Amino acid sequence: MEIKQVLFNDENWKKLIDFVKSSSWSESPIIAKNWEEYNYLEWERIFAAFENDNIIGHCSFNNVDCVPDVDYTPYIQSVFVNEKYRGERVSEKLINTAIEYAKSLGFKEVYIVSGHINFYEKYGFIKIDEKKEYRGVLQGIYRKEI
């Protein structure tokens, strides 16, 4: 398995968008639309996990996430792994790749917004806040010092 950056203008962009659109996650249509329409800052990135040239998972590294009126940044978001590959530490590899990228940019901490309990803690994230996201659903905000 290999983790690669996927930029909107590279050869894997369409493959990534097709993977997102066809995935089982209920957020996938929103994520695909946002990724296609988003005006990326120079340092923001999307990472994809590849197995034999097939995308099996993804995450993004962005300035903002789905919770308004907070000063936290940057975020690792949209972490998803195909069901067939769960349990193989793909999400951990995606998150660690995003963290290494954040370090290379000089960031000292990263954040994740999630409703999952006891998931990101195993990767060293600590819940620091709770906020309602754009649909009004309460989400935890997790931080990891890097």
Can you name each region flagged by the protein language model?
Residues 48, 54-64, 75, 80:
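Conserved beta-strand in the GNAT
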Residues 64-76, 86, 134:
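A conserved beta-turn-beta hairpin within the catalytic core of GNAT-like acetyltransferases
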